Amino acid sequence: LVDCDLRRPSLHTLFNLKAEPGFTDAILHNSEPMLQGTAVENLWVLTAGTKPPNPADILGTPQVDQLIARLQEKADIILFDAPPVNAVTDAAVLGAKVDGVLLVLSAGKTRREHAERAKEILEKARVKIIGATLTNAPVDSSMEAYYS
């Protein structure tokens, strides 16, 4: 799991890890990515690292391609956490470098037109959208019987 939200990184806090060195440090210094273990078996995190002045510039470099290749040697599946598509160009820039993008939509927060705009931005950047997931959806009490 790679924290590519270089403007507002959060995975280090979520998993109680050291923030640095991380993704940007590996890119800027051409060093091995500092993967950190978590309490979740077989889950390794590469934190965002040092905040760069312009994240989109870093995400667009060939060094990111090289880092992705190095990570592919270490893991079967790599997930990149990126900032919102509509807010900054970072997700579209990164999305063009990976196999596919999963849009994460928040129930009751993400407006339909924002989701549609995000889809348009990614399609314009020739990013493969593999799907979407809805978070924070309320639990329907009628479904509880199914799991009982």
Label every model-predicted segment:
Residues 1-148:
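P-loop NTP-binding module
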